[in-house]
Amino acid sequence: VRSAPRSPTPRKRSAMRRRMLLFVLALASCRPASQIVMRDVPALTWDSPAGIAFDPADSLGTSDLHVVVRYNGSFREDTLTLRIATCSPDSLRCEETLLLRIPPARTAAPLRSEYRIPYRRRVRFGRSAGYRMTFTPTRPVRGIESVGLQIEKSR
């Protein structure tokens, strides 16, 4: 003789809800702590704007921004001056100049080095999509392979 299936008791239902809630919270918190957006540039001579577009992973918390430059042994200078233009989703625009002191490449010319410099700290993005940045060297430069932005959660 089989008995009819019983529905879970209120205590079991509550425990199942808690487990499901913990599972959903664990999935939601699995966002990467860092996001990087790069743009390749002509390594022979870079003299034109290089634009990136990004959607910040976290628009509620604060983020630290780092400018990232990948370069090879052809880069013989010790500084690089960039004009950085930023455009937010609501079309607010800001442009500024940033001087980077780049250490010499310690690798053979075909291999690349990467340099990362802090750009902004504790930035709060107002929206979660539609940001654009343009990096332009103030003079033609050789040996730069790509330029971009790293966004990481503030500590």
Q: For each of these PLM feature ranges, what is it?
A:
Residues V67-S74:
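Short amphipathic, basic-aromatic surface patches that mediate peripheral association
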